[in-house]
Curated annotation (Swiss-Prot):
Residues in the Extracellular compartment per record: 27-495
GO annotation, biological process: negative regulation of Wnt signaling pathway; Wnt signaling pathway
Tissue distribution of the protein: Expressed in both the mesenchyme and the ectoderm of the carapacial ridge.
Organism in which the protein naturally occurs: Pelodiscus sinensis (Chinese softshell turtle)
SMART domains with a match to the protein in the record: APCDDC (SM01352)
Gene: APCDD1
Stated name of the protein: Protein APCDD1
Function of the molecule: Negative regulator of the Wnt signaling pathway. Inhibits Wnt signaling in a cell-autonomous manner and functions upstream of beta-catenin.
InterPro entries (UniProt xref): APCDD1 (IPR042425), APCDD1_dom (IPR029405)
């Protein structure tokens, strides 16, 4: 039974919403003005949308992140979980940087996607020298490094034998036939003083040290809980190209062992590990992928080809359709928008990947797209193109959305319609109980995974679920989202959120009576 006071508050809030927010309110719909239940449904939808809006707006306002320039990397940095590199390779990292510019890095490799069964460890020693701020990747710092020594330790006899054979294929005779490698014994793969270099068999490179970024933030606005993150350069998605590739994006960040998220169990385990005691992470069951609800970026993301963006995905599992909002920026903290893309289409039912443990394969089709230039430079660029290559010729204006479906996409942005992509997803749950959604890493060469053989074997930065269910496609009103997620967002959103939240709390028991 609902409380009398709550009933009065409910109708008072409805009056405030209807009177104070005006026709621009997301709560007002033509079909919702005459029926209380329709109003409640609209209010609940606005509550969910404002949750996602609030999370993205937090990123677009800088997310209270401080970027250290030049970065101070001295200290001990560790992975926050089991990382997946293209191949796939399952790895955790533990890197120490010393005051004299030397470093010692552990790379622990595993036989599965939960990092519970270590197979071998690389111990890398060398020297690093920070250079200037990157001219290519804003917010990053370029660096040079020199290797002194690379050692390998196998954690089982079977792995030792396999690695011996692998190394001998690229370095014939490196491992004597009468003296194969043994378990838990350290062997040199690279030694500077005698010219020993047999790392090619493992497609090994430390070019990740050529691009560095350090971020600091206080979790939950608590000045006693500083978290420092070290972003190192990305690894080429084609393993054979790693030793020739200069990073143009970042890997998942390492956290400072001294200033890390206290909920990170993996951080503490990896911190205490070494080559003879590799980290064994707590086992977890793979979560079944359910593509439904709404998901948003957790940080300003960096892509190869110097792209900064945030993403908002909406999945309608009742009819296997999806919507994607891609907000592009000119800066590494996503404060200065350049253009937005709204895309929608269909996706297939998921199939467990036979190549990437823990992954689920999907096929996504894009058949509808809209573009909005958000600055003068982008609008001018789009207006340069002749004919019907990207919307109506010469018609682009800042902040005005245009449908490019009828021109089969937008040549200026490298997008052709219709378009098909072969995707891989995985789902995890963080320490706070939030669901995370990972989709496939984009190819380092800038191409698209438009064929099955180009399907990713590693993942992008995860999205976090902001709403467990999605509005019906006709209710999503993508045209209204451009302004809300840009730096030009209206100022009324917080009041809408609070009023809607109060309305939801006060109508909960009312709904139960009628259910």
């Amino acid at each position: 039974m609902s409380l009398p006071c709550c009933g009065r508050v409910r109708y008072l809030l409805l009056a405030l919403l209807l009177h104070g927010l005006g026709e621009g309110s997301a709560l007002l719909h033509p079909d919702s003005r005459s029926h209380p239940r329709s109003l409640e449904k609209s209010a609940w939808r606005a509550f969910k949308e404002s949750q996602c809006h609030h999370m993205l707006k937090h990123l677009h306002n800088g997310a209270r992140i401080t970027v250290q320039m030049p970065p101070s990397i001295e200290g001990h940095w560790v992975s926050t979980g089991c990382e997946v590199r293209s191949g796939p390779e399952f790895i955790t990292r533990s890197y120490r940087f010393y005051h004299n510019n030397t470093f010692k890095a552990y790379q622990f490799y595993y036989g599965g996607n939960r990092c519970t069964n270590p197979t071998y460890t690389l111990v890398i020693r060398g020297k690093i020298r920070l250079r200037q701020a990157s001219w290519i990747i804003r917010g990053g710092t370029e660096a040079d490094y020199q290797l002194h020594n690379v050692q390998i330790i196998s954690h089982s006899e079977a792995v030792a034998e396999k690695l011996s054979q692998l190394v001998n294929r690229t370095c014939p005779g490196f491992v004597p036939g009468n003296s194969p490698w043994e378990q838990d014994v350290s062997y040199n793969l690279w030694r500077e003083e005698n010219g020993c270099e047999c790392t090619r068999a493992l497609n090994f490179a430390m070019h990740e040290l050529q691009l560095i970024r350090v971020e600091k933030q206080y979790l939950h606005h608590n000045l006693d809980h500083l978290v420092e993150e070290l972003f190192l350069g990305d690894i080429h998605t084609d393993a054979t190209q790693r030793m020739y590739y200069r990073p143009s994006s970042y890997q998942p960040p390492l956290q400072n062992a001294k200033n890390h998220d206290h909920s990170c169990i993996a951080c503490r385990i990896i911190y205490r590990s070494d080559e003879h005691h590799p980290p064994i992470l707590p086992p977890k069951a793979d979560l079944t992928i359910g593509l439904h609800g709404e998901w948003v970026s957790q940080r300003c993301e960096v892509r190869p080809e110097v792209l900064f963006l945030t993403r908002h995905f909406i999945f309608h599992d009742n009819n296997n359709t999806w919507e994607g909002h891609y907000y592009h920026y000119s800066d590494p903290i996503c404060k200065h928008p350049t253009f937005t893309i709204y895309a929608k289409g269909r996706y297939s039912r998921g199939v467990h990947s036979s190549k990437v443990m823990g992954g689920t394969e999907f096929v996504f089709k894009v058949n509808h797209m809209k573009v909005t230039p958000m600055d003068i430079a982008t609008a001018s660029l789009l207006n340069v193109f002749n004919g019907n290559e990207c919307g109506a010729e010469g018609s682009w204006q800042v902040g005005v959305q245009q449908d490019v479906t009828h021109t089969n996409g937008c040549v200026a942005l490298g997008i052709r319609l219709p378009h098909t992509e072969y995707e891989i997803f995985k789902m995890e749950q963080n320490a706070r109980g939030s669901y995370l959604l990972y989709n496939g890493q984009r190819p380092s060469d800038g191409s698209s995974p438009d064929r099955p053989e180009k399907r990713a074997t590693s993942y992008q930065m995860p999205l976090v679920q902001c709403a467990s269910s999605a509005p019906r496609p006709e209710e999503s009103a993508e045209e209204n989202k451009i302004g809300r997620y840009s730096s030009r967002a209206p100022k009324k959103d917080s009041s809408v959120f609070m009023l809607t939240l109060m309305l939801f709390i006060c109508t909960g028991s009312h709904w139960n009576i009628h259910s």
